[in-house]
């Protein structure tokens, strides 16, 4: 817990170091504010990524990266999450660029890749929406839900669990794909559990995921 138990010796061991980045679109999460204030007091340099400069996070961090998310219909926090992740990607690209890890051309190409994702998503969404609706119709009365992923897909599993809590308040669990085989595989009445497994072809765990 960065707000309480994180070793102080790892904070402020050099002037304005390390860089501590806190992310909260609302900026009102109390523990995030506490963590930032503790890190800042210990000598770390703090950056808040938030949509509200006047929030707890906005007032606690030394610098703010302001998010501007257009208003849209109310829904579980998917857009805010995507914008926060995009901000972190862009920040990482910029840090690598100024540190000379790659050229300006490479940095520019990576930014364009991120921008192009919006067009790709717009193209894919209609079919995805139809599929998701069909699955939702089949799964609406499930007792609980499992979300399994490995590597970079593990975060997707975590996000899936969070959205089930937020949207419908049903029991859900996120788990590593390998661990699912050793634990959740033995749960009774699997027909009452909606199980979603991420299986990207470029994931190094792809072969094991297919076995699952």
Where are these regions (language model features)?
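Glycine-rich phosphate-binding loops that contact phosphosugars or nucleotide phosphates
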Residues: 1-116, 150, 190-212
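Anionic-ligand anchoring segments at beta-strand to alpha-helix junctions in alpha/beta enzyme folds, i.e.
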Residues: 1-20, 140-190
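Ligand-binding beta-strand-loop-alpha-helix segment within the catalytic cores
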Residues: 112, 116-119, 123-129
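A short, well-structured juxtamembrane/interface segment
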Residues: 124-141
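A general structural signal for well-ordered alpha-helical packing
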Residues: 132, 136, 157-161, 210
């Amino acid at each position: 817990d960065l707000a309480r138990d994180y070793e102080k010796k790892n904070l402020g061991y050099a002037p304005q170091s390390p860089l501590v980045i806190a992310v909260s679109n609302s900026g009102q999460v109390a523990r995030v504010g506490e963590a930032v204030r503790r890190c800042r007091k210990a000598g770390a340099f703090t950056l808040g990524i938030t949509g509200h400069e006047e929030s707890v996070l906005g007032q606690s961090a030394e610098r703010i990266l302001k998010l501007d998310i257009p208003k849209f219909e109310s829904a579980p926090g998917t857009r805010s999450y995507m914008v926060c992740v995009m901000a972190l990607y862009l920040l990482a690209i910029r840090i690598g660029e100024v540190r000379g890890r790659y050229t300006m051309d490479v940095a520019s190409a990576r930014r364009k890749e991120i921008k192009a994702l919006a067009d790709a998503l717009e193209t894919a969404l209609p079919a995805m929406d139809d599929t998701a609706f069909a699955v939702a119709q089949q799964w609406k009365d499930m007792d609980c839900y499992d979300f399994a992923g490995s590597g970079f897909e593990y975060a997707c599993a975590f996000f899936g669990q969070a959205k089930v809590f937020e949207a419908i308040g049903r029991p859900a669990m996120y788990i590593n794909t390998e661990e699912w085989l050793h634990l959740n595989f033995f749960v009774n009445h699997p027909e009452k559990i909606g199980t979603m497994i991420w299986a990207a072809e470029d994931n190094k765990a792809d072969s094991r995921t297919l076995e699952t």
